[in-house]
């Protein structure tokens, strides 16, 4: 045995000894007390108290194992001869796609606003009320991050460390919110798994990266800009377009407008001529009613209405903090943010009869956070292409034209043939069976699916539930925006238990089913998206892939010149005709490649469920997206099929 082998054996034996001599951890199926610490802060900030949870927690199955009363039970004495370990602490962050609750909130406001007496509230309009309710969703996420997640994320820590934010935090903690919003917030309550209680699921923006998430996390500021547009003296017919043209944020050198974030405005340039187009996707169609000509006409006649003095923030990758932007905590926006919260809270208390606040809600617990929607590829409701100032009335756009600008669902690009591999034609020089180049090889049969309005706006969805198969339990799931949108991942691997590995590691295999987002294509960074489809699942539902020796790597053999016998290459399929225009490899790993970094980000995935591997600001090398939760909860989980929210909830 080599010295390396003996060292490894000693380490394993020492690890087993340490586990055996430590106090055994008894794991039960009943959640431990979830009251949490009084504060999760080192700055002394107070924040919401932690009331006793009043949501039922998961309990053991009715089919509990029988008691140890067998013939040899006393001699075997398992309680004294079994080592237990509940695993290491692990935080799974949940980032809702807030377009979906925003869609529902907008419809709620549209259907009810005319019943309210709003003239005496100068900051209240349909747009500002929608913005307020969306703001409270982001405020709830922050409060859970700051006072329930332990440790709090780096983004939350930056805010918690400054007393300048305390007045605003207190204001939104005590602001009044209608009961309707709690139907959505209840699906964001924290949860610990029953058996694996060291795994905690918390709603948090601690993993958010601007180029991956910005258009899916709706900024309340866009509704303040819509409110301002309603009282402008511009022509009614251009009010909606002027709102789409409004600047929301400067990110690095990019000017991001409302039209970028909701996909309602794009442009096409030919020579020196630039033409703007408006296009109403399902999201923009809902929001357009907040700033259309009819709404503009109604509120322009109000005797008392005030403009929000919103200052456009400028950030870059190093300074962007989603909580600062979404909660409008910039120094030059704090006063107007306080006025906004207090005015809309008073309105909700008086007109909507709201009596509940976030302060008393964040410490509750529910397994509903693990329910989500699973989607296939969908057309974006945004684009990151530049928008010039709108100077003339726009033209009517369409789906195909918008997808070209958004670079979604593009056809296969032409092979430029700009690089030629060397190919030794002398058969005595090389064994061609082991050479990866084909002379005059055939073209690939792989072809991407191009953008299709019906397929990519009205495709069916799946509802995932790890605990139940009751369809009515998913009413709030479809509103919540908790989703996994997967375009090209066809399967994930599961690291199998190994008795020679420490028990703590074995019971902490929580990253199974996740993808390091260094491998994922950013959606808001002008990347071309080609939808090479997954293979049909007909006749292969029982298919499996088994990885030997090391599941963290994919081995491509590099043989010595002199070998024991001629090797047989099997258990793989040739991907014929690779030419740089089609995928050449169909595997990505979190491990650093021994052959250099990945040439491209080819995974097309967005997931609400993430993990950040350290306590610093997130980066593409520390954030993992979960492409499935089945490797955490098992395939016993329930799957149901349903339609999109914009098909289920009609606009009034």
From Swiss-Prot:
It is found in: Virion. This is Capsid protein. The keyword Cell wall biogenesis/degradation does not apply. It comes from the Viruses. The capsid protein self-assembles to form an icosahedral capsid with a T=2 symmetry made of 120 subunits. Its main location: virion. Residues 34-47 have a biased composition (Low complexity). Residues 1-11 have a biased composition (Polar residues). GO terms for cellular component: viral capsid. Keywords: Capsid protein, Virion. The keyword tRNA processing does not apply. It comes from Atkinsonella hypoxylon virus (isolate 2H). Residues 1-70 are annotated as: Disordered.
